[in-house]
Swiss-Prot record:
Origin species: Lactobacillus delbrueckii subsp. bulgaricus (strain ATCC BAA-365 / Lb-18)
Protein name: Spermidine/putrescine import ATP-binding protein PotA
A cellular-component GO term for this protein: ATP-binding cassette (ABC) transporter complex
Catalytically driven reaction(s): ATP + H2O + polyamine-[polyamine-binding protein]Side 1 = ADP + phosphate + polyamineSide 2 + [polyamine-binding protein]Side 1
Enzyme Commission code(s) on record: 7.6.2.11
Gene name tied to this protein: potA
UniProt binding sites for ATP: G37, P38, S39, G40, S41, G42, K43, T44
Quaternary structure annotation from Swiss-Prot or TrEMBL: The complex is composed of two ATP-binding proteins (PotA), two transmembrane proteins (PotB and PotC) and a solute-binding protein (PotD).
Length: 362
């Protein structure tokens, strides 16, 4: 069931800067969504328009089928967890979580029960009397989430709320947030510039740049089938080469012809070819589809990150569990399904239509 709809939303500031350009999106109830993009892409502006903190210059915002474009933020069934958590330092954990219910003058017995339930949901049982300064960053974040969910919102907005945590704690909180969302069954909308966070937690990702949605889809679809150069580079590491479509399921790049899994592109058309570093296997020169010379190698714990130069001068990035020697000539092998062909200037709608056409012929 649709819970949030943005209909042709545009945001232009007084200085002429256009933060959002004709944004259309529909979000279903009970799912975890991520708005992913670099700084200035418009993701936080979308969040603020949904929350009611920022007015759109044009377009409509719908909540549960009702037009809330001009509805005050305090009257929306939407709560927000901010980047800095916005906890009250002079109040303890219980008082922070209970704050909204006390403002509404709810009975003390109800407040105690709801605070207890909220703290249990975020795994902070026994922390009610702790002072905020006594908590770790991850614990403070969970207090902020408990405070946000105590009003039982239908939608929870999270604005870059993992960015202040160290790497280990960020990874832990990814599991925590996903578990909390599944337990509550409400819609989470998570803003981040970190593609790993978005891939790990989301049911669906919206990739933004320059005020536009460049692609939307499941984490697997976004990663495996980027529609353009920006998405391919922003979502994970990529080798992106210039190529030419030979015919359906055949493409030329790096001076050779290869089988691929793409079709529906005009023969002879210039394209871009994406190969992910983890899809490249290092083998002997005789067994490889291409020959490369190793330039550098970094050991990153679970794999080696290898940079190598192809015979055409292209610099390849390869992820391998096996190390190699600097200066060594090796072969790289990949399957047709590892090759992703991108049409120059193709929109997401055009890509989806092309995909349906040639998949329907199978």
């Amino acid at each position: 069931m649709e819970i949030i709809k943005l209909d042709h939303i545009t945001k232009q500031y007084d200085d002429g800067f256009v933060a959002l350009k004709d944004i259309n999106l529909e979000l279903e109830s009970g799912k975890f969504y991520s708005l992913l993009g670099p700084s200035g892409s418009g993701k936080t502006t979308i969040l603020r328009i949904i929350a009611g903190f920022t007015e759109a210059s044009a377009g409509k915002v719908y909540f549960d089928g009702q037009d809330i474009t001009n509805l005050d933020a305090s009257k929306r069934h939407i709560n927000t967890v901010f980047q800095n958590y916005a906890l009250f330092p002079h109040l303890n954990v219980y008082e922070n979580v209970a704050f909204a219910l006390k403002l509404r003058q709810r009975p003390e017995s109800e407040i105690r029960e709801k605070v207890k339930d909220a703290l249990h949901t975020v795994r902070l049982d026994g922390y009610a009397n702790r002072e905020i300064f006594e908590l770790s960053g991850g614990q403070q974040q969970r207090v902020a989430i408990a405070r946000a969910i105590i009003n039982e919102p239908k939608v929870l907005l999270l604005d870059e709320c993992l960015s202040a945590l160290d790497k280990r704690l960020r990874k832990e909180m990814q599991f925590e947030l996903r578990a909390i969302q599944k337990k509550l069954g409400i819609t989470f909308i998570f803003v981040t510039h970190d593609q790993e966070e978005a891939l790990a937690m989301s049911d669906e990702i919206f990739v933004l740049n320059d005020g536009e949605i460049k692609q939307s889809g499941s984490p697997v679809d976004i990663y495996d089938e980027p529609v353009n150069d920006f998405v391919a580079r922003f979502i994970g590491d990529s080798n992106i080469l210039s190529g030419r479509m030979i015919r359906d399921f055949a493409v030329e790049f790096a001076g050779k012809d290869f089988e691929c899994a793409d079709a529906g592109i005009t023969p002879g058309e210039k394209v871009e070819v994406v190969l992910r570093p983890e899809d490249l296997d290092i083998t002997t020169p005789a067994a490889g589809k291409l020959l490369v010379t190793v330039q550098s190698q970094l050991f990153l714990g679970d794999h080696f990150e290898i940079k190598a130069i192809g015979q055409d001068g292209f610099e390849w990035l390869i992820h391998s569990t096996n190390g190699v020697q600097i200066g060594q000539e090796v072969g790289i092998f990949f399957d047709p399904e590892d090759i992703h062909v991108m049409r120059l200037g193709e929109t997401e709608e055009e890509f989806d239509a092309r995909l349906e056409t040639y998949e329907g012929e199978d």
